[in-house]
Swiss-Prot record:
Organism ancestry: Bacteria, Pseudomonadati, Pseudomonadota, Gammaproteobacteria, Pasteurellales
Compartments, record wording: Cell inner membrane
Transmembrane segments: 8-28, 41-61, 82-102, 117-137, 150-170, 180-200, 249-269, 289-309
SUPFAM superfamilies, A to Z: MetI-like
Name of the protein this chain belongs to: Peptide transport system permease protein SapB
Coiled-coil segments: none
Gene Ontology process terms (BP): protein transport
Originating gene: sapB
């Protein structure tokens, strides 16, 4: 097992090295950074790598602000949106996937399957402004710009207003909660569609496969209820297989989040990166690419550890020579 752990650590280190190389190549697109390779490109790269290891991403092209401080400002809103979206996607996707598998021959299940494939093909950059337009016409009590109304002063402790508001001792906390939820409603609704449909599709296929196995059919002939079959066979053989899909779904949500932030004015890293591309701020682009890559690598690593604990069969790969 020790060799397997070392192999995974080396793999993560290699990915981080590739990310740093990618950031260095992007950085060299800016003529102002040509001094990094005046002597030798290898010396310039190792100098850049050393600054990254110290947590120094440099400064922005416009304004000369510290990139580390900017990233610590724009990253939490994006992670907040992604985690809430994933939570809601699992809350709605798991039961709907099971229901569609149990009643696979009914109209509801067929409609849900068709809807899941349609939802996977909807372009998010088109859906966000459409829903914003519908919300404005229908007078929905939601907000479309920012995380909360700037009239409310929320002291940043964790970087997530949805958590920081509970540390405030103010008489109007209920109004703050309502305002934050109103700002979260529209971007979360837009982002939830695609991962929810993906989870429904995965759960439906796996649960339907389990229900068609001989042991499930034998349990039915023995008089077991549907709930007992689901509890004994379907849940135990379906949900653990969904855990390895978390990094892929998270990456999908993070990618879509960049477009939604731009369309709905969410102050996250996606909107910041797109603005950096428009301004040709290569320092910011390089730092943003590295930070997003590190987030995905961390999610993938935690998922592998959780899968190792949850699924005994995965331990074979860790103990293999």
């Amino acid at each position: 097992m020790l060799w397997s752990v070392l192999r995974h650590i080396l793999w993560v280190a290699l990915l981080l090295l590739v990310l740093s190389l990618l950031g260095f190549v992007i950085l060299l697109r800016d003529p102002l950074n040509a001094n990094l390779v005046t002597q030798n490109i290898y010396i310039g790269y190792f100098h850049y790598l050393g600054t990254l290891l110290q947590g120094d991403f440099g400064i922005t092209y416009n304004g000369g602000k510290s990139l580390m401080n900017l990233i610590l400002t724009v990253l939490p809103p994006t992670l907040e949106l992604c985690f809430i979206t994933l939570f809601l996607a699992f809350i709605f996707g798991l039961p709907l996937g099971i229901i569609s598998a149990v009643n696979s021959e009914q109209v509801f299940a067929k409609s849900l399957q068709i809807l899941s494939y349609v939802g996977l093909s909807i372009p998010i950059f088109w859906l966000a402004p459409i829903l914003l337009y519908v919300a404005a016409l229908s007078h929905w009590e939601i907000a479309a710009i920012g995380q909360y109304n700037l009239l409310y002063e929320i002291k940043s402790i964790t970087g997530f207003p949805v958590i920081d508001m509970w540390f405030m001792e103010v008489p109007y906390r209920t109004k703050i909660v309502q305002n934050i939820l109103q700002h979260l409603a529209l971007p979360t609704l837009v982002l939830c569609i695609l991962p929810t449909m993906e989870i429904i599709r995965i759960i439906h296929q796996r649960a339907e496969y389990i229900l068609n196995q001989n042991f499930s059919k034998v349990a039915t002939t023995r008089g077991w209820s549907k709930w007992k079959i689901l509890h004994q066979y379907v849940f135990r053989n379906t949900f653990p297989l969904l855990v390895p899909q978390v990094p892929r779904v998270f990456t999908l949500v993070l990618t879509q989040c960049m477009l939604v932030e731009t369309a709905l004015g969410w102050p996250g890293i996606g909107r910041w990166l797109i603005n950096a591309v428009n301004e040709q701020d290569y320092n910011s682009i390089a730092a943003g690419v590295i930070v997003i890559g590190v987030c995905i690598i961390l999610i993938d690593t935690f998922t592998k550890i959780f899968t190792f604990i949850l699924d005994p069969f995965k331990k074979k790969g860790w103990y293999a020579k």
